[in-house]
């Protein structure tokens, strides 16, 4: 297996970092906000045993540049196509986690000839009030406090749910990289939700809806999502398959990579 390497894609709006490794049919991984391609650190080596696996940092997050304007989900979808064109990939499967799932679905809707199979992981739905909370929170972004209290605030934000200090540290590092600017991918996903219900109904490719049994827990506690708003995806894509991973959380890609990889590999083999 080829080692997983890091590289940059040059675009008119700045550079996009991506990780790539393995050989075979391509699989693109798109992370949630405000994380980065580090979200797939545990998963990539497993999937790269049989595939060419690519994970990109969404513009404005991780080690990708900040975009010069507010990006929409459609803009993020165009960056996916730009990366595929750069790598000579005509058709690929995609796994998108939460924010990345919205972008993955838009790629499949806007460029159906470029998508083989689609995996939508923990792609939650929102009502109008939740959308407003998300937009307000991420438009402001994370603020730097003079006394450094923002550092402890980010550490405490998810430590009880992530479970491992090392993983929480990685999440906080991703948080710190997007301080001082709006978190555009999260804003784009929240703004896109009503459109997503119509856009995702256009999908024809084989689609897996993968969710963690406990993925909603922290979102419900934060007032960002409710269980009763989570049926839209199956309705929008009636031909989709659905798998719920027992014990899976919002960070199950890091916490349970072997279990997630088995589900992904089994679906892609069909």
Residue ranges with predicted function:
Residues 1-15:
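N-terminal cap/lid segment of alpha/beta-hydrolase-fold proteins
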Residues 26, 52, 90-93, 114-117, ...:
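Structural signature of beta-strand start/N-cap positions in the alpha/beta core
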Residues 105-110, 116-147:
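Flexible "cap/lid" loop of the alpha/beta hydrolase fold
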Residues 41-42, 54-99, 253-254, 262:
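Active-site loop/oxyanion-hole signature of alpha/beta-hydrolase fold enzymes
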Residues 129-130, 145-202:
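Conserved alpha/beta-hydrolase catalytic His-Asp/Glu region
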Residues 14-63:
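Conserved HGGG/HGGXW glycine-rich cap/lid loop of the alpha/beta-hydrolase fold
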Residues 207-248:
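Conserved loop-alpha-helix segment in the C-terminal half of the alpha/beta-hydrolase fold
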Residues 237-270:
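Catalytic active-site module of serine/aspartate enzymes centered on a nucleophile-bearing elbow/loop
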């Amino acid at each position: 297996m080829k080692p997983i390497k890091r590289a940059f894609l040059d675009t008119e709006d700045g550079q996009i970092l991506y990780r790539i490794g393995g050989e075979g049919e391509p699989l693109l991984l798109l992370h949630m906000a405000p994380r980065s391609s580090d979200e797939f650190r545990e998963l990539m080596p497993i999937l790269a045993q049989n595939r060419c696996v690519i994970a990109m940092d969404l513009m404005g997050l991780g080690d990708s540049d900040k975009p010069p304007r507010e990006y929409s989900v459609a803009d993020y979808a165009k960056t996916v196509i730009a990366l595929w064109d750069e790598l000579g990939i005509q058709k690929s499967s995609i796994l998108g986690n939460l924010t990345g799932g919205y972008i993955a679905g838009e790629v499949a809707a806007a460029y159906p000839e470029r998508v083989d199979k689609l995996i939508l992981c923990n792609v939650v739905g929102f009502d109008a009030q939740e959308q407003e909370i998300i937009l307000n929170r991420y438009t402001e972004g994370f603020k730097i406090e003079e006394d450094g209290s923002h550092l402890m605030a980010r550490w405490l934000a998810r430590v009880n749910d992530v479970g491992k200090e090392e993983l929480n540290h990685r999440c906080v590092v991703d948080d710190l990289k997007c301080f001082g600017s709006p978190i555009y991918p999260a804003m784009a996903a929240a703004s896109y939700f009503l459109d997503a219900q119509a856009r995702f109904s256009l999908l024809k490719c084989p689609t897996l809806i993968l969710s963690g049994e406990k993925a909603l827990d922290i979102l419900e506690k934060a007032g960002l999502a409710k269980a009763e708003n989570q049926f839209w995806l199956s309705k929008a894509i009636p031909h989709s398959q659905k798998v719920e991973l027992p014990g899976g959380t919002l960070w199950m890609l890091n916490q349970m990579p072997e279990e997630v990889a088995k589900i992904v590999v089994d679906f892609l083999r069909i």
